Amino acid sequence: GMPVAIGAAIACPDRKVMGLIGDGSAMYTVQSLWTMARENLNITVLIFANRSYHILRGELTNVGVGNPGPRAIDMLSLDRPALDWVQMAGSMGVEANRVTDCASLEAALEDGLATDGPSLIEVVL
């Protein structure tokens, strides 16, 4: 997650760090973006935006809830209101891009890895 990426960037300031995280999990530590910007850490974060707390759906299955009701499913949605990771990152001082296809992802990764300081790529799934 993002806090681990911060730790890695502080431990190895001469290396680029990549953080990979889902949008639901990232919501638990969104303030990490501000820390990345404040400390000018050399991190590129990829947010995999499936617009859901999908990991919690798996946990429902793990505890025997094979077919959750519509209210439970609604509680796992991150689209009301929709999250805008580009806007959130920008408001905390982190450059960000949104990508929806492989070609755009490749270009955004090249930019993120070539640029010093923090950046974020919202990968819309």
Walk through the language-model features, giving the residues of each.
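Thiamine diphosphate
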Residues: 1-125
